[in-house]
UniProtKB/Swiss-Prot annotation:
Gene Ontology MF: a single term: channel activity
Residue spans, topological domain Intravirion: 41-100
Name of the protein this chain belongs to: Glycoprotein NB
InterPro entries: InfluenzaB_glycoprotein_NB
Membrane topology recorded in Swiss-Prot or TrEMBL: Single-pass type III membrane protein
Glycosylated residues (UniProt): 3, 7
Annotated family: Belongs to the influenza viruses type B glycoprotein NB family.
Quaternary structure, from the entry: Dimer.
Transmembrane segments: 19-40
Pfam family, one: NB
Topology feature Virion surface, residues: 1-18
Highest classification ranks of the organism: Viruses, Riboviria, Orthornavirae, Negarnaviricota, Polyploviricotina
One CC-aspect GO term: host cell membrane
Any one GO BP annotation for this protein: proton transmembrane transport
């Protein structure tokens, strides 16, 4: 009365390959979109940064573009809240910015 045994020898290997390919394509698509969103966010925020090299401003507020900003003279108020890395939410701009 042992009818609950399963025979795995008749499993179609094509279905396993097809499932693996679908999962690989989905993961690759997500990674590519994340990378492109991160690169686009860097290039969009690079032009909005205030650079202190020319010495026109003392206060530097970097929101999402820290690699392109000089923060030595940053005396702005400390930031509060939770930072959301741009690689988690690509293309989503949660920082306060002035419209062009």
């Amino acid at each position: 009365m042992n009818n609950a045994t399963f025979n795995y020898t008749n499993v179609n290997p094509i279905s396993h390959i097809r499932g693996s390919v679908i999962i690989t394509i989905c993961v690759s698509f997500t990674v590519i979109l994340t990378v492109f969103g991160y690169i686009a966010k860097i290039f969009n925020n690079k032009n909005n940064c205030t650079n202190n090299v020319i010495g026109l401003r003392k206060h530097i507020k970097c929101s999402g573009c820290e690699p392109f900003c000089n923060k030595r003279d940053d005396i702005s108020s400390p930031r509060t809240g939770v930072d959301i890395p741009s690689f988690i939410l690509p293309g989503l701009n949660l920082s306060k910015s002035t419209p062009n």
